[in-house]
Each structure stands twice: as structure tokens, then as C-alpha cells.
Amino acid sequence: MRKYEIMYIIRPGVEEEAQKALVERFAGVLTNNGAEIINTKEWGKRRLAYEINDLREGFYMILNVNANAEAINEFDRLAKINEDILRHIVVKEEEK
């Protein structure tokens, strides 16, 4: 398994309960596919560098995980489909 950092931005209009459910759902996608979540950071609502779908703000979430390729691919696939996630990026951390 490799270390990854995942950052995703949630649409600002999502209610707090739905936002928590979304975060838990995507954490579940990773853990159900064999990933281990090391750290979760909620950056909260921040201004976007540029407009995405006419939106200027979003809720930022950052995850550090140990995962295999299958877990990352499934997360990526579902994040692309979900309309409440504006953008996401997965970065592989280098071995030291």
C-alpha cells in the first residue's frame, strides 16, 4: 500500500447533515476497499481561486490515507459522478 493525500471540495449549498454524510460515505468507500485513513482535516468554507459552476466558495476536506490502487480508483470514480463534489485531487506521497 502507498500513502496518498486526497483533497476534495464540497458544494457550499449542502446542508451540514448532508455534508457529514457525504464525508462519511467517501471515507467508507476508501475503508471498504482496504484503505487506512491516517488523518482527516476539515478546512471549512473557503473562497475558491476561480469560479467553478458559478460558485465562489466551497468546503475543503483533506485526507491522508494508506491505500491500494483499487481504493483510489473507486474514490476517483465516485467523486467524478457525485454532483456535490466540485473538484478533487489525489496525490501520491513519495517514499522517503
UniProtKB/Swiss-Prot annotation:
Per the record, what is one GO cellular component?
A: ribonucleoprotein complex
Tell me the PANTHER family matching this sequence: MITOCHONDRIAL 28S RIBOSOMAL PROTEIN S6, SMALL RIBOSOMAL SUBUNIT PROTEIN BS6M
What this protein is called in its record is Small ribosomal subunit protein bS6
InterPro entries recorded: Ribosomal_bS6 (IPR000529), Ribosomal_bS6_CS (IPR020815), Ribosomal_bS6_sf (IPR035980), Ribosomal_S6_plastid/chlpt (IPR020814), Transl_elong_EF1B/ribsomal_bS6 (IPR014717)
Which portions of this protein are annotated as coiled-coil regions? none
Q: Which Gene3D superfamilies match?
A: 3.30.70.60
Function as written in the Swiss-Prot or TrEMBL entry: Binds together with bS18 to 16S ribosomal RNA.
* HAMAP family reported in the protein's UniProt record: Ribosomal_bS6
- UniProt keyword annotations, A-Z: Ribonucleoprotein, Ribosomal protein, RNA-binding, rRNA-binding
Q: Name one GO biological process term.
A: translation
Similarity comment: family membership: Belongs to the bacterial ribosomal protein bS6 family.
Determine the domain of life of the protein's source.
Bacteria
Single GO MF annotation? small ribosomal subunit rRNA binding
